[in-house]
Amino acid sequence: MNKSFLSFINIFLFLLLFHGAGISSEVKREVLRFSSDTAQIKKSDGILHLSGEVKITYGQYVIRSGLLMAKTNSINSPEVKIIEASKNIYFSNNKDISAKGDKLFMDVDKKFVSIEGNVEFSQGKSIIRAEKINVDLVTETVDFEGIKDSFIKN
């Protein structure tokens, strides 16, 4: 079988499993939209694996990576609860902030994001490099750990 046919089958199965092109979360009923080179579903565990040129949009937020795993609360629930990503992480609010790093963890219900490993957070012309950042998406508060070689431009 060719690669595009297998990719089509994986996406079709995902759509059947999660009942639509987006996955809704219980909090504010935001829709997770995604694209990737490949997708694999483990229905028995409620886990979706995406790889290659992965892009997820959740409300105003964008996550790009090489590998991404989305977990539901249970096999009977289409709502994604946890997102974990690795390989060339990029996170943005589509306004004024973006961050790059090695690994990302997002709790969709709590609207919390953690990025770690060679993190580069930028806002405007300012760049803060750190080992880890934690972002509260509700209050838009960012906590930094292990800051190094950073600058803030007014």
Tell what function each PLM region has.
Residues 1-154:
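Mature-chain termini and adjacent capping regions
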